[in-house]
Amino acid sequence: YRKYHAPMGRLVYIGSAPKGAEKSAELAMNGMKAICGALKVGGKAGDAYAAWREVAASAGLADYERHHCGYMVGIGFSPSWTGGSMVTSLFPGSERTLEQGMVFHAHSWFTDTDVVDYFISNTVILTKDGAEVLTATTPENLVVK
């Protein structure tokens, strides 16, 4: 809308979901909750990644890593907010201080593991009270059949 972006993503299976998809969906949802729980005013961007990694490790995926679990979004002009070194990401060890009003595309993404692939993402805004999901469909509404 007027160059503002609020991305959201869900992995959708066509037909029947593979065996284990429900467990993978729960893992991804727990990862999203951990990311949102770690986004706090005055905190560090790397804290969100660490919280997501802890969920992965607790599920037996101690060696599973991604380059980040979210990135800042908002108004976008070419080239875009989807890449480049100027984009603030929720990456391992990031010392970027989080501020009220920052908006992130947070994602909990598990692919190419010994569990079934699953992915969810939401746009969240950092408020004085923590992360608030802005996208209309929350992870709790997912149904795996």
Would you name each region that the model predicts?
Residues 1-145:
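Active-site neighborhoods and metal-handling regions in enzymes and metal-associated proteins
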